[in-house]
Amino acid sequence: IKTGEVSGYNDVGQVMFKTLANTVNQKEVIKLFKKNIVKNFGPGSKYWKNLSLRKKYKKIKWKTAMKGPWIHQNILETIKNIKLKKTITGGTKVNESDGYCASLPFYFSHNSDQKTKKIIRTVANGKISEQFAMAKLKIIDLADKGDKDPVNTFLRKNIKNKYFNNVIENIKKVKKIKSKPHNFVVKKFGKACSYPGTFNGAIHAIITSKSFKTAVIKTIKAGGCNCSRANF
């Protein structure tokens, strides 16, 4: 298997990471992030050059992997909205992980929920995308601080938090079938990139794995949009 290339999801996160690393005035992060999104994914980029091939692949039954990178719907909409000079530029047609990936390096360097939500909405302007992204960040934060069972700790801390109602219900659904094989669980909740399926599949991998490596291998084997799940 050829390795060395990251997914479009991870690339969004890397664009934010590089933006943060090269920004002196933190008030300009969103402005510069938008500029870098267009530079990395827009006209002239390897993603943009693959647009016609992407359109073809959406119409046919896949037999082999598409050569080159795949630009996400959220990013296509974001680039369009940036050019239209919209205040909130994120995509609205899908509920996927772009917002989470963009916010991951930002959240851990700023630790501000309000500012993080603005970052999420910069590339994924939807309530579902925001809520699940914030939940993932909170769970990772718990693990980063040494919590041995971050998923259950998050559940306990937010059981009465209305903002996370949808997230809590989905974690409970996953826990009910924790003993089932991972491939079965991913197929049941959905292999596609969208929430809540991508979140549920990742949660199952986390709570049934003993290490990061085994969780990622399990995630890859389950197929579908394993990149969005593995980035969590």
Q: Positions of the model-derived regions?
A:
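Structured, active/binding-site neighborhoods that engage oxygen-rich ligands
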Residues: 1-232
